[in-house]
């Protein structure tokens, strides 16, 4: 299956994300350098998605390029099924994470990066994403869909913070 958007890999660089898409970028401090390795394991194991309330089925236990995943969630009476594939993995000494891109059937069309970064004596988590409506109902639901996306982003960050605190 092909990705549902042409800018595959664009989340690698903030400046190369498409200007005509809804763009999200949020960072949060998790703690000192001691939480870096556990945070990386949590993120690569799809912990942010699970911690935000998504049921995640993935073809590998940890994110690697080509991993296929399906996320499922309920938002009130609405059930969402969101297939995606890992586009790339970052595995550097002080930066680790992955980005996934949407596949046919996903309500949105775009890419999302989940990154853990050690900066001096602090560990940070960052989410960087761009998206456009991918289905008729996300086009129709415009502002509500953006609100749900914003809530999901905060829930991802909350899940990472809770995990870093030992929860």
Map each language-model feature to its residues.
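Long, compositionally biased interface segments
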Residues: 148-167
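Hydrophobic-ligand binding "helix-grip"
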Residues: 75-120
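Short, intrinsically disordered, mixed-charge
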Residues: 40-48, 105, 121, 158, ...
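Hydrophobic ligand-binding cavity/cleft-lining segments
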Residues: 1-76
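Hydrophobic side chains in beta-strands
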Residues: 28-30, 71-73, 88, 118, ...
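Beta-strand/loop substructures that line and gate deep hydrophobic ligand-binding cavities in soluble
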Residues: 102-147
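General beta-strand recognition
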Residues: 70, 97-99, 124-126
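Short amphipathic alpha-helical segments
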Residues: 31-34, 38, 144, 148, ...
């Amino acid at each position: 299956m092909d990705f549902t958007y042409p800018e595959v890999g664009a989340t690698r660089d903030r400046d190369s994300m498409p200007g005509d898409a809804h763009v999200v970028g949020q960072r949060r401090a998790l703690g000192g350098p001691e939480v870096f390795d556990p945070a990386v394991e949590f993120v690569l194991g799809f912990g942010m998605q699970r911690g935000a309330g998504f049921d995640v089925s993935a073809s590998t236990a940890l994110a690697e390029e080509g991993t296929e995943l399906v996320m499922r969630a309920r938002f009130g009476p609405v059930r969402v099924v969101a297939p995606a594939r890992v586009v790339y993995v970052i595995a550097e000494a002080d930066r680790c994470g992955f980005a996934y891109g949407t596949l046919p059937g996903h309500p949105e069309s775009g890419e999302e990066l989940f990154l853990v970064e050690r900066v001096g004596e602090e560990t940070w988590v960052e989410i960087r994403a761009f998206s456009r409506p991918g289905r008729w109902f996300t086009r129709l639901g415009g502002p509500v869909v953006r609100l749900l996306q914003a809530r999901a982003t905060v829930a991802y960050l909350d899940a990472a913070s809770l995990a870093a605190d030992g929860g």
